[in-house]
Amino acid sequence: MKKILVRAPFLTQSGYGEHGRFVLRALRAYEEFFDIYALPINWGNTGWLWEDTAEREWFDQIISKTVVYNNAKPAYDISVQVTIPNEWQKLAPINVGVTAGIEVTKVAHQWIEKSLLMDRIVTPSQFAADIYQNTKCSVKSNETGEINNDFKTPVPFHVVHYPYKSDVKEEKVNLSLEYDFNFLTVAQWGPRKNINNLVTWFVEEFIDQEVGLVCKLQVHKNCYMDRGVAHAQLKGLLAKYPDRKCKVYLLHGHLKDEEMLSLYKNDKIKAFLTTTHGEGFGLPIFDAVCNDMPVIAPDWSGHLDFLYMPTKSKKGKTKNKAMYAKIDYTLAPVPKEVVWDGVLIAESQWCEPQQGSFKIKMREVKKDYSRFKSDAKKLGKYIRETFSADKKYKEMAEVLAGESLEKIDLTDIPKISIITSVFNGDDHIEHFMEDIVNQTIFKEKCELILINANSPGNEEEIINKYIEKYPDNIVYKRLEKDPGIYSVWNMAVDMATGEYLTNANLDDRHAPWAYEKQAAALLRSPGSDLVYADMLITEQPNETWSANSSNGKQYNFPDFSYDNLKMVNMPHAAPMWRKSMHDKYGKFNEKYGSAGDWE
């Protein structure tokens, strides 16, 4: 299992924030391969998320775990840095840079220099990768003094697109839209998004018509003051057209994915507009496509990866076809006011959408809406399948790991025997039983062998309740006297019918997927006989994996070696092992009072 550190603005309301969350979701989907750590960072002036969700709870657990680990001597196998390349560092033996690239024709030479710190680079679009890879700069050889004016980064690039979020359920946002035909735009109001022209050209085209434009905008943060700034800017644009018939609506503030979905599915919102100067990917455009909404956009930059789809011609040849309304454009130098030293350079160009073409496309979409809607439905179906979360999470996880990752089919996991000694466990037995039966593969793959070592407690009453519920999964035996814990374990080994064994103490608690992941690790590693895990350290008894007082405090056991085993019993925390080991090495040594599992 690789220790992997993600440094990203994953708690911010930003494109890079969503990119960071995508990386973490992909790693979580393949959690059996990774020990995940995460450091949240700021992203400009954007706000931070405050949603109280299960995912946010998981983020907080990972952050706490990272803080505790970093107070020791952290040693990560891989770092993943989701940010602009200027901030990339060597943080681990393997370093992966994840960036949206730059939405112009060249990257800064600093990016080429920083790329050399990375072992591989991930971008969300082919456009972003091509611009980065094809930019040349001048370098001087330290050995010969020779200058190479055509130096390009030699670091390998991987394109991993954002996934379609099929699990998002719509939550209605109440909009009072006066007209039945409305366009939608979603953006942070900055120079690159070209909002001033979009609004102005829309009003000029539909000044005397019953058409609306919904603008989901923020300038920096989704706060009340920011709303005032956005409202003033929009009001200033519209002041030139006091007698217009068309409507322009400002929608401001943070909307959850579920609420954003309701915009794309609103019966009165018909198409998505963008006059962007360039996109690394274009998430709002992508969301529109995923929900069968016709798109009007310039024919340049990252969003083209999902606005074209392969189609067969009458002659049977397959070619990529534009499934949206294309705006004509020219490439022009970026304005001086947007130049950003080390990031957005003066020698670069970006897309200038043509006013006339934009107006024509809006007119065409409104007039011939059924044709554009038909194309949008075809494209949406294709993108939902091609960009599914399962596919994209696998692509991302494999790129980050640097190797193929194959999940184990649960049907291939052999039977697991859980061996437990019961003694003086009244305070723990109910919570213990609930913890075990809630394992993801308990009913299908597990048998729980409970041996009561003549305990003076009343554990049997609780155990019998669970035997009634799970008669095929629980084996119970009561002894007349206590022979010692390792004698009990050896009895359980003899009784076990599973190919894999694990011990579970009454005061232990497990992640609900613990046995599934341990068994999968054994199945995936035929040369290994035992797997073990790290442990959270809690302050209170009977806490659960999802709600406990560990605050990230944990034991991080080292990789197995005989030298390390002399120092600490690394596999002590509920290991899982092959039953066949007992045929080769015998059973637990009953002479030891507390170290039989170490010996």
Placement of each model-derived feature along the sequence:
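A conserved acidic beta->alpha catalytic loop
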Residues: 452-461, 481, 505
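A recurrent flexible, glycine/aromatic-enriched loop bordering the glycosyltransferase active site
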Residues: 349, 555-576
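Short, acidic, metal-binding catalytic loop of nucleotide-sugar glycosyltransferases
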Residues: 434-445
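Acidic donor-binding loop at a coil-to-helix junction in glycosyltransferase catalytic cores
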Residues: 593-599
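Extended catalytic core of nucleotide-activated donor transferases of GT-like folds
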Residues: 5, 45-131
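Glycine-rich, basic loop-to-helix element that forms the pyrophosphate-binding segment
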Residues: 260, 479-496
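Short aromatic/hydrophobic "clamp" motif used to bind/position activated sugar donors
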Residues: 501
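Conserved donor NDP-sugar-binding/catalytic core segment of glycosyltransferases
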Residues: 513-546
